[in-house]
């Protein structure tokens, strides 16, 4: 069986839900950017058409060129529920690590909830620091009928965020990236029994 054909089933869809049906007060809300009314995250996900589900795309890249060459971490979720992961670190002569797996609909649904709950679709990167010699990070998301593409410098800590011209917006991206990286490292680690850097 190839890596592409492998499917990760972390839990049933009912176990993946953050909110319980018994307590509607726990439902998180996200502002629908296409209209002025506020909808729950679940309502927004329920209104997705099949084409919008197929068009969902998320890509994150962080990297720099330094003493060891071009070092980077990149992952993306593509149509067909594919997760592609690449980690290029030349430290101690390590080689490029590339992995590809298929994830369940429940995992993709949770990623969409994380995106909606973060509020990243409402942000703008015009006041964020430009990529520089420290490095570069990019976040691209296609979700429903919206497409965002952000580019900024590599951010090491919340201190870097606080020093920026848009600390609130950059903080949204910082925390979203931390959540996504934890999820991706867990998925890759669980599946391949490796320790992603």
From Swiss-Prot:
<dbReference type="Pfam" id="PF02792">
    <property type="entry name" value="Mago_nashi"/>
</dbReference>
<dbReference type="GO" id="GO:0035145">
    <property type="term" value="C:exon-exon junction complex"/>
</dbReference>
<dbReference type="InterPro" id="IPR036605">
    <property type="entry name" value="Mago_nashi_sf"/>
</dbReference>
<dbReference type="GO" id="GO:0005737">
    <property type="term" value="C:cytoplasm"/>
</dbReference>
<feature type="compositionally biased region" description="Basic and acidic residues">
    <location>
        <begin position="1"/>
        <end position="10"/>
    </location>
</feature>
<dbReference type="InterPro" id="IPR004023">
    <property type="entry name" value="Mago_nashi"/>
</dbReference>
<comment type="similarity">
    <text>Belongs to the mago nashi family.</text>
</comment>
<feature type="compositionally biased region" description="Low complexity">
    <location>
        <begin position="28"/>
        <end position="42"/>
    </location>
</feature>
<keyword id="KW-0539">Nucleus</keyword>
<protein>
    <recommendedName>
        <fullName>Protein mago nashi homolog</fullName>
    </recommendedName>
</protein>
<feature type="region of interest" description="Disordered">
    <location>
        <begin position="1"/>
        <end position="43"/>
    </location>
</feature>
<dbReference type="GO" id="GO:0008380">
    <property type="term" value="P:RNA splicing"/>
</dbReference>
